[in-house]
Amino acid sequence: MKTVKIALLGFGTVSQGTFNLLQDNVDLITNRSGVTIEISKIFVRNPDKYTNITLPSTAQYVTNIDDVLNDESIAIVVELMGGTTFAKDCVEAALKHGKSVVTANKDLLAEAGPYLFDLAYKNHVDLRFEASVLGGIPIIRTLYDSLGGNRITELVGIMNGTTNFILSKMTDEGLSYGDVLKEAQDLGYAEADPTADVEGLDAARKLAILASISFNRRIFFEDVTVEGITNIDTEDISFGKEFGYNIKLIGIAKESSKGLSLNVYPAFVPLTHPLASVRGSYNAIYIKGNGIDDAMFYGRGAGSLPTGSSVVSDIMEVAKNVAFESTGRFKPFYFDQKNIYSPGKIQSSYYMRLAVDNKTGVLAKFATKLAEQKISVLSIVQRNKDPETAVLAIVTSKCPHSYILNLIDSFNSLRSVKDVCSVIRIMEA
């Protein structure tokens, strides 16, 4: 049986999860892959931090990346450091040295994925990245392999566990955004600086990677229109329940004859849709294809062992390719023109919450403004906040986003409108 040597770059949460699975399941992994996978080197800045971890006799810590790159016996470099600068240098150098790479680095792939895939192909090595999106959910290989014969028309998902935890808590317990964010930070679900999660940036990077595979285009993070959850209020969630919706931060990529739309935003999801029941820190991705019809994949989107499981899966696959001298067969998957569809033209139904004067005749004025924008009202609820102020919650018919922006301006021009408090898209069932 052939032995394939690997090197781990970084030894943080995901890397240690990968290490533990490789050690704990060594017999299973060897029998299933037909290859002995041997950890040879672990690149770290300070080995003294890891004195409590017992390495196998084959492995050693190194502090110079050249000790990995120049070691011809190492066939696979597993990049688990994160970041887009030094990590990119390491991945690029490894590929040029004829080493296959496994990475969980979504930021790097969203920024430089097409270049790195081309580089891997030119050097006849593999670049695998299952763990870069949705952690333990095996969605990457599913898209380019299991669903390779399908024309994907739409993918929509809950791609960030932190925001789903926050919104689930706000929904289930009626807590404010600020209170739940603090709890998420205390539990380790959210970083001290939660910007990447709560502003939708993390989900946008994942969507860029998934859309690249699904629609065969060079999609970058900058192509995704992004809106976060920081303005979501418990009052909106309460109205949403009344209308039959749960609030979720979704990433959605959809192809039509007009082009490809790429968006991350908070949306009301109908309770009849499977994504509405995804709670806590779990992730899910819902796919529509012309062969599979509809399918949903659900699981842990982060964590040491769930993400490590996806990393090990890639290591096993690449190790088999190394053993049979068949690396570099994975051709870059983008061959169609990008043609991104303007966000202003995307049609959705919308929920709007307004604070207005509690007087007769106000609704008639709203009806006039709605008619001017050719927007119909599907549902409306009024709650009297105090003798002078009423709160209106409106669900509109489907219309382009540009129409809603014009409607907001029209509402703001009315003296009877005190505030357009929130505007939230409604996902189709």
Label the model's feature ranges:
Residues 63-104:
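Rossmann-fold NAD(P) dinucleotide-binding segment
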Residues 179-277, 282-284, 303:
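Substrate-binding/catalytic subdomain of NAD(P)-dependent oxidoreductase enzymes
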Residues 310, 315-429:
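A conserved regulatory-domain signal marking ACT and ACT-like small-molecule sensing domains
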Residues 74, 121-202, 209:
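Rossmann-like NAD(P)H-binding beta-loop-alpha module
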Residues 11:
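Glycine-rich Rossmann-fold phosphate-binding loop(s) that bind the pyrophosphate
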Residues 87-93, 97, 106-144:
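Rossmann-fold NAD(P)-binding glycine/threonine-rich loop
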Residues 25-53:
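NAD(P)-binding Rossmann-fold cofactor-contacting core
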Residues 15-16:
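N-terminal Rossmann-fold NAD(P) dinucleotide-binding loop
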